[in-house]
C-alpha cells in the first residue's frame, strides 16, 4: 500500500479516503488491466497476433498483469461486461469456440508467467514456443 501511495504522491492512510480496502484496490487494478488487455487485442486479426499483443502487454505491464491474473478475481465488483470485452478478440479468433479460447488463454498465461519469472533456459527460443503453441 505504501508503494502505491508513493506512486500516487499521497500518504498511505489517504488511500482509504478513496477505497475501502486492499481488495478494492486490487479489483480496480484488475479491471484496468482487463480493459487495457482487451484494447491491446481488439485490433489484432488472428491468433498469432493476439498472442503477440497479449505477451507484449504483459511484459510491458508485469505488475498490473500479475494483479489481474494471479489472484482470485472479485467478479462481483468488476464493471459489467469487462471480462467479456477482454475475451472478445480471442473468442472471435477461434470462431467462438469457448473451450479452445480457454485452452489458448491458459497456454498464453503459462508462457507469459514463465517468461516474466525467468523460468526459461537462457538459450530457449521463446518466440518459437509461442508459435508452436498457437498453431
Map each language-model feature to its residues:
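Helix-turn-helix
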Residues: 1-24
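Alpha-helical structural segments
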Residues: 7, 24-43, 49-53, 67, ...
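Short alpha-helical functional segments enriched in proximate histidine and acidic residues
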Residues: 40, 57, 93
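Amphipathic alpha-helical segments that line or abut small-molecule/effector binding pockets
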Residues: 47-63, 102
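Short, hydrophobic secondary-structure boundary micro-motifs
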Residues: 65-69, 76-77, 120-124
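Amphipathic alpha-helical packing segments from all-alpha helical-bundle domains
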Residues: 74-103, 124-135
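Amphipathic C-terminal alpha-helical segment
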Residues: 105-123
